[in-house]
Amino acid sequence: MTRVEPRRLVAALALLNLGVLVYCLCVLTTTGQTVDQGLMVSAESLSGDLAEICAEFVELVAPVSAAGAVLVVCLIAWRGNRIALALRAGIMTLGPIATAWILKYSLDRPNLDGLVQHNSFPSGTLTCVTAVVCAVYLATARRWRIVVAINGALLIVGTAVSVVVLKWHRPSDALGALLLVGCYALAVSAFPIRISSPRHSTLADPGNERLAQV
C-alpha cells in the first residue's frame, strides 16, 4: 500500500457535497421539481425513434453488467495482490449500489409540483452500470485502461440517456448516480495499491531467473 493521495479525497468530498446540492435543488424545491420533470418529459417527446433504440439498449445493460462483474473476478484472480484488489473492487461495486438503494428508500420527495410520486433519486440502474465500469477500470492493467475508459463511457452515457428518455428517471436522478459513483471512485483510488501479475512476481525474484528461461 502506498501513501494516500489527499487531493482525491478532497475531490470525493466535493462530489459528495455537489450531490447533496443537486438533491436539495432538484428534489426539495418547487422550481427544481418542475424543471426536472419538464426535462424528462421533453426528452421523451423530442427523442422520436430514439426511444425504441433506448429500450433495446437497456435490455443489454443487465448482461453487460454481469459480464463486467465476471471480468472483475477474472482480473483479480489473474493479477497479484488479490486480497487488496478484491477489497477495492468490492467497495467500488457494492458500496455505490448499496448507498443508492438506501438513499432511494430513505430520502423524501415532497409533493411540490402537484405530482405525487415516490423518490427516485439517485438512479439505481445507472449506479450499478457505472460502478461495474469503474471496478473493471481499477482492476485492469494501466496499458488497457484507455480501452476500458472509452467503452465504459459509451455504456454509461447510453444508460444515462436511456433511463431519462424512457422516463425511468429524471435527469437529477442520473446526475446523482454519477456523482455518487464518482465519489466512491475517487475515495477508493486515493488509496493506491501495487499490483503485478503472477508472472511478473515470479520473475522479480532473482532466484527464479534460470527457471523463467526454461
Locate the predicted segments by residue.
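N-terminal transmembrane-helix/juxtamembrane module of multi-pass inner/ER membrane proteins
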Residues: 1-65, 104-113
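Hydrophobic alpha-helical transmembrane segments
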Residues: 58-80
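Membrane-water interface at transmembrane helix exits
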Residues: 26, 75, 100-108, 137, ...
